[in-house]
C-alpha cells in the first residue's frame, strides 16, 4: 500500500482510529497539498564527531535563512530549540530530535522526552534507532518506551532508523535495500507514526520498501553531496518511489544560498520537478 496517501486514507487502512491531538500535529507536518514533507534538519551534533559545520556555527542566522525558504518542518535538538527557536515559534512546525548516538555505540543518550517536545510546542518527536548488530535490542527498547509515552501526549513519533553492516568488523551504515526494508519493518512494528530511512539508490527497490510499509516513509537527506544538483536528483528519485518526502540537513545549509536551497527542494518534493528545473526555478 502506498504511504503517500492522504491522512484519512492512512487512518482507514490502519484501523480508522487516531487521537485528535496526534492527527492535528500530523496534519500540520504534512500540511502541503502534495501530501509530502519537505523538512530541514538542524541537528548536527556530537554524533558526527567532525566539529561545528560552517553552515550551523550561527544557528539563529541559519534558522532565519531556512525559515525564509518555507520548509514544512524543522528538526532540532532540544537545547537549541530552547535557546534559538523563540523568534520562529509558530512560523514552521517544530520536530524535536531526542537522540544523541554514534554508529559504533560509543554514545547513546536520550536528551528529550515526548513531554519535553510538547512543552516546547513541537508537532513531532523524533528518535533515532540503529538496527543490525548486538545492540539493536537496546535501541528498539528505547523507541518502544518513547512510543508508549508519546501516546499519553498525543504527539507523533518520527523514527530515524538506520541499518548497519559490519564488513571488516567496523560498523557502517548499510544502504542495501533488504537492510533498509528490515529497518522500516522494525520501526513499523514498534508503533511509530512516520519512518525516516536512508535512500537505497534504486527507485524500484525503494518503491517496494514504501509499498510494503503500513506507515509513511520519508527519506533521509544523506551525506553531503558534491553539489546541490546531486542532492536534488537523489530526492527527485525519492519522490518517484512514492515516498512521503524527505528530511534534508547538510545538503541545505551546507551550501551557499540556503533560502534558495530550501525552495529548490520544495520544488522537487511538492511539484515533482527535476533537479535541473528546480535549479532554474530558484536561480541557482
Where are these regions (language model features)?
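Alpha/beta enzyme core
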Residues: 39, 44-46, 51-74, 80-89, ...
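Thr-Gly-centered strand-to-loop micro-motif
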Residues: 220-221, 248
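Short acidic/histidine-rich active-site segments
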Residues: 244-253
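C-terminal helical cap(s) of enzyme catalytic domains, especially alpha/beta-barrels
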Residues: 239, 254-284
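N-terminal amphipathic alpha-helix/helix-capping segment at the start of soluble metabolic enzymes
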Residues: 10-43, 82-91, 281-282
Amino acid at each position: 500500500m502506498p504511504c503517500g496517501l492522504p491522512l484519512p486514507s492512512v487512518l482507514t487502512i490502519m484501523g480508522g482510529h487516531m487521537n485528535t491531538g496526534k492527527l492535528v500535529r500530523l496534519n500540520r507536518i504534512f500540511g502541503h497539498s502534495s501530501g509530502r514533507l519537505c523538512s530541514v534538519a538542524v541537528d548536527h551534533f556530537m554524533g558526527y564527531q567532525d566539529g561545528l559545520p560552517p553552515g550551523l556555527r550561527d544557528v539563529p542566522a541559519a534558522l532565519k535563512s531556512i525559515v525564509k525558504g518555507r520548509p514544512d518542518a524543522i528538526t532540532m535538538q532540544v537545547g537549541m530549540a530552547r535557546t534559538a527557536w523563540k523568534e520562529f515559534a509558530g512560523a514552521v512546525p517544530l520536530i524535536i530530535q531526542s537522540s544523541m548516538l554514534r554508529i559504533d555505540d560509543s554514545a547513546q543518550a536520550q536528551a528529550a522526552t515526548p513531554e519535553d517536545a510538547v512543552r516546547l510546542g513541537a508537532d513531532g518527536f523524533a528518535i533515532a534507532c540503529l538496527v543490525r548488530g548486538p545492540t539493536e535490542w537496546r535501541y528498539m527498547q528505547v523507541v518502544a518506551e518513547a512510543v508508549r509515552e508519546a501516546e499519553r501526549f498525543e504527539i507523533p513519533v518520527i523514527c530515524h532508523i538506520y541499518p548497519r553492516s559490519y564488513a571488516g568488523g567496523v560498523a557502517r551504515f548499510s544502504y542495501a535495500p533488504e537492510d533498509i526494508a528490515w529497518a522500516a519493518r522494525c520501526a513499523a512494528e514498534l508503533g511509530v507514526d512516520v519512518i525516516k530511512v536512508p535512500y537505497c539508490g534504486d527507485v524500484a527497490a525503494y518503491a517496494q520498501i514504501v509499498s510494503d510499509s503500513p506507515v509513511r516513509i520519508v527519506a533521509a537527506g544523506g551525506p553531503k553531496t558534491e553539489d546541490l544538483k546531486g542532492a536534488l536528483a537523489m530526492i527527485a528519485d525519492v519522490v518517484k518511489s512514492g515516498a512521503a518526502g524527505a528530511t534534508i540537513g547538510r545538503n541545505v545549509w551546507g551550501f551557499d544560498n540556503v533560502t534558495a536551497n530550501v525552495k529548490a527542494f520544495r520544488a522537487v518534493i511538492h511539484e515533482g520537478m527535476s533537479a535541473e528545473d528546480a535549479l532554474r526555478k530558484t536561480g541557482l
